[in-house]
Amino acid sequence: MIPDFPFPVPIVSAIVERQRQGVTEVLVQVRWKPDRDSVYSGTFEIPAGGIELGESIYEALRREVFEETGLRVTGFRPEVRTATHSQNGDDVFAFVPFCCQQQLSGRTRVGFVFVCTVEAAEPLPAPSEVGQIMWLPTTELARLLAEAPERIFPLQFPVLQFYLSQSTDG
């Protein structure tokens, strides 16, 4: 059972995409956390996780993608755009994600979603979190969301819907 928290947990999520023979594919993984989340273990998700103290949003995204897939992020969409400011020891910056997400009940989260590309290598699932990793064409991802929404981790369902609504080939 996942406890409720008094404040939302800040997270990052990565929609990892690649072009293969003119088709856009999205990396999806099987969530595998039976000891920590027996309800949703076995559902499809995208790489995501918490932002560590002192870590920039982009550092967190790179770390989470690497931890869960073994792949290194090579680019972002939209391109990285930031504004920074430092004053009295406070370092801050503004950034533009692809979209944002919020979980309102259960383990409440507020997240920042980025579309990114990774190195051309085979993914290696993190055994403590990920059961399997696959690349799905956007058309197949759209069919999965329409025909079997219960197979998608709920936090990522609206994110993937939004992504597909913005896609030119999904």
Regions found by a protein language model. Give the residues of each.
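Structural signal for conserved beta-strand scaffold positions within catalytic alpha/beta enzyme cores
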Residues: 28, 78, 134-137
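Short, cationic motifs built from Arg/Lys/His that form the positively charged side of catalytic pockets
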Residues: 30-31, 63-67, 134
